[in-house]
């Protein structure tokens, strides 16, 4: 088919090409010739329109059969000769043949376009013919015209065929018309059909569109309805879900509350059980104590009676001595008062004389002033006259040259010379007059100055007289004022004209004499004031030290005279050299004379036999002028006024320190050079002004005491030697307690060796710090993978709604918690931001803070931060990034002021990026993955370092960290301690949970401030000696391999500062005597293995060390105290900082910590221990170290200090006795005179002293405190003195009571004890009667004691047996009642009321009955048994064994059931049980409603537990019958009555075993009902367990029914097909279910929990965290 189409197309193209080539010339000729013929034919063409020619028909047929023609043409051969010949013939003849037309028509395409083309051709032909017919004349012209190629071939007709052409045209016209008509009809028909079809199509389209629209509307309605239904369904589902969630939350909350309540109940039960066991132990101890006290009381009474009989004459003698001494003291006091009165009168007389002198001087001064005024007026008048005369002369001499002529020039010159000569003469006379007047004025001024000086001295003397009670500060202030006045008065003298130098030289001797007199008066006044003040403060030393005080004051006065003269005449050096030389000569002469006189006097005073230590008091006074306690005034030196003022200020500051807080390290202050250091002088002056006065009271320190008192000198030497020997013996005993002791010299040498080694090898901190500050920071580009920022930015409105800010630029604080996730791009606008806290906000990076330049505090804990960008935040101080995902330390470049950085719980492997952190002090990187710490060398300022719980095998980079104070390295893989050769400030070192096997590295380190050392849970088998750690207080070496006790003692030897020691988990604890050995080695130990020790020595640490180490130790203690006080000053809640003020305080704390660390490091490097002596004294002011009050220990300490003081000479070492508080001489005499009293008092300390004796002792102490002899001792009396005073007071009260008892023995008929022994103080006058009654009284006492011992022992044994039985039967606690702990506590007084009061006339005060115990005659019907074999009562067993049902009853019912005996007996068992059941059911229902229990058994169990845990109220002391009834807990309640007669009648039934038949019936019924109820309860439990196993999981969980079930429960998960747990959990289900455990099982559970809670090696968590069971979390 395709081939035919191609051939047809080719043929058509060839035909048209040939037709176009045909020549038209022949056609034109034929047209011209046949014009006429064509006209005729055109005329006849109209008629022939209806006839169609064959060609037209042929065309029509061809059109109709075009398909056939096309097929024929396709099949026709292209080379057919006939067709082409016919075609040529037709062309030659000029006619168009049918074949041509056939070809023309056949060449048209089959489409409609070919038909239209044919119609156009025919129409063109028709128009041509029609035009020819209309214009025949134009034919010729048209023929000659050039035929265009566009002209169709059919228009040209040849002349030979004219006829044929006419017919052809007509037929063709007719055919055309008919064809047009037919075509029009066809077109109309087609249009009609088309219109109908279009209309039908429109209708169909419209219907289809309508249907489509309906369909779309239906779909929309369907969608709307569907959506509506879905919304309704969703709402219903949401409501249902919300309700379900709410119900689930409510049930979960109820479930949690129920679990928590049950857990609390279980914990309370456990606590009650432990408390029960503790109370039982306490009860045992109390009973043992009661027996011990009774035995002690009996022994004390017996010994007291024996002692009284033996020592009664000695006591009388001592009482007489005491009276005589009291009388002597009164006489001394009277003498002292008399002397004081005389001194007062003398001072008043002197004051009166001075006042008279003052009045005379005032009158003289006024007279001189009047004379001065008169002379002044006269001089003024004379001066005015001279001035007027001089003016007149000058005027005359000025006019004289004008009158003289020029001829008389010589005479004129001579006249001028004379005039000039007259003028100087007048000036000279005026100068002389002025000089005379000035000299007179100077004389008057000198007189006035002298008057002023005298007035000032008188005023100052009066002021000093008024302030005689003031010690050092007012006297120094007066001296300074005197010096200021004298200097102010000497200043005008320097401004006097040089012309008056001679007059001054003439007046100088008189001024010197006057000044010397003033100085003498001033010194005398000061010395008198000092003497009076000393006498007022120490009246007991008034008569003893008057002579020495006067001598020493005279010595100081003479020295002051020379110094004052030097100061008063020092200004003469400025006037002239001669005057200065004369003044120096005078000063030297006066000094030499005074020195000679002082030496002569002192040699004469000390010429007698004296000790070697007193041979050089002058040298001691020169080197240590303030050691003499009788001279409170400082020795004046030639220093400036500013230095004096500084000294005064320092002395004032030191005077504020309380007198109890003086340290023993003050001896080191005294050892310093007093002539150089002003601080030392101030301290010594203060100590000399009254603080060291008690040091002279001992009386046994003559070797070191510079000024011994008269009483000590007069006392016999034998007593002194005995006291010294006793002190040496006590010291030897105290020193002999320690084994393997290390001498002080050894400790000193080893400590000093380590310190010197450190001094030689340490790197100066200043150099390290300077290098760190000036190092160049090289910025390294670190490729940190930042997570894509896909989170939304922080909402600005959320930031602004929490404050009064209007824009983000004003926001200073941002705090959020728990945000879903955000980015920090919003914070770029917060330029004023200072605090940023975003916890649990889902942050992945810390970026966008570059514009927050004022940011100080960042808290981004508990996020997912992986990248940090906080560059160039210079104000940033604290950054908290705990619990994130960091893998390295980065992003802090330019944060130069960052001080605290916390990065715990991250994934950091190495420490780096700390180059720019020049002030970093706290770095926390615990719980990371660290394997190296080399980056720490970039931050040498670190103070606190926490690298715990990492993977470290060694610590590097801390060599330059010279300020490190706390290092935490627990939970790593360390094999040895880190190198600490440059860390003198280290205070805490934590090395727990490592693999350390040796600590040899610590032996060579100098760590003077190390307080806490923890090496627990390691592999230590040996430890180095630790005595070189002078400040070590806490040591933990638990869970190691220490096994040798002797080595342990050697390691801990000489560790005098150690207070807490933990050795748990070591094999050494298996030794028998390890505890005693440790306590002997460490007498100051207070806590051993977590247990507080009651008996520990409270000695000072400095006492155990050598004197050369005490200053160093004081420095260390001071620095430690400063470090401990600094956090308390600034920080209260360090990690809850959300205010700007708190952040500023934290920053200031870090700054002060850095400053203090610098100072302490500098002090250690320079070896300057004197810089903190005054501060140490101030520190001890706030923290005084009170010693133990035990008298024996205090005596040991006192004697030891005395002997140590005797060993040192005062010239080579400081006297430690200056800081030891010693008793006064009067007390020393009493102690020496009462040796026997002390022995007896020591024996009687163990006995009990009655309340009267205690009140008497306190009264005596108050009286002694108010007396003038002890005014200065109230604040500074040491504990030994106080202990001695208490012992003496108690001994005196004991003697007074014995005297009272002796007087009471005179009247044995009196049965009531004396209420006031002081009133009834009578002497024994009838000894014979006392001796006869003594035997009878002793027999009575023995009988009474025997009876009491038998009865109390029986009761105690009975109670203990019952308690043991109850404890053994605890496992079956459902059947027995709990043990009432208060039943063990019986009132001794109430029991003793049953016994008559013994006749205590022959007993001392210890056996007297109490004041509230009235004597009661013994009733013969009380006991119904033999004295040798007492019968055991049967009924007391009811006190512990009772009906089980009564245990469930509440306390209210117990109170309601207390009624009379008759009412109880009238009750029947049925009514009793029904009443109990009624109350029980009401109580159970109430509890079930309140707690929401579904099962009544839970309420029953709760009631039982509440009954067991209920604390009983304290019972009042009732009558004996009621007391005994409550004690027995019998079912028959005894009525509470106040009648004494009824109680007397009931005493008959105390010890009778009586059981009535009614009681037996009640017991049988109660047992039957109890068994029945028990069976029903067990059946109910079984039924409940079986029906709740396959129920709802919430209802059947182990926690919910923990208190209800009694059988082992099944897990609901197991019933639902879950897995069965084959491996037990950390805490099994039975451990938490405490209802099934008895007391023994509970104790086993606690042991198991303790074992499980022990920390394991290489644990990931901190050892300080608490462990909880999985069910309880």
From Swiss-Prot:
CDD domains: IQCD (cd23767). LRR repeats lie at residues 34-59, 216-239, 491-516, 641-665, 830-852, 853-873, 874-894, 895-919, 921-939, 940-961, 962-983, 984-1005, 1007-1029, 1030-1054, 1067-1090, 1378-1405. Residues 326-374, 549-567, 588-602, 647-656 have a biased composition (Basic and acidic residues). SMART domains: IQ (SM00015), LRR_SD22 (SM00365), LRR_TYP (SM00369). PROSITE patterns: IQ, LRR. Keywords: Leucine-rich repeat, Repeat. InterPro entries: IQ_motif_EF-hand-BS, Leu-rich_rpt, Leu-rich_rpt_typical-subtyp, LRR_dom_sf, SDS22/Internalin_LRR. Residues 603-629, 1168-1226, 1308-1325 have a biased composition (Polar residues). Residues 291-320, 1280-1309, 1340-1369 form the IQ domain. Residues 22-48, 189-208, 324-374, 544-658, 679-702, 1163-1230, 1308-1330 are annotated as: Disordered. The keyword Coiled coil does not apply. Signal peptide: none annotated. One of its GO terms (biological process) is single fertilization. This is Leucine-rich repeat- and IQ domain-containing protein 1. It comes from Mus musculus (Mouse). The lineage of its organism: Eukaryota, Metazoa, Chordata, Craniata, Vertebrata.
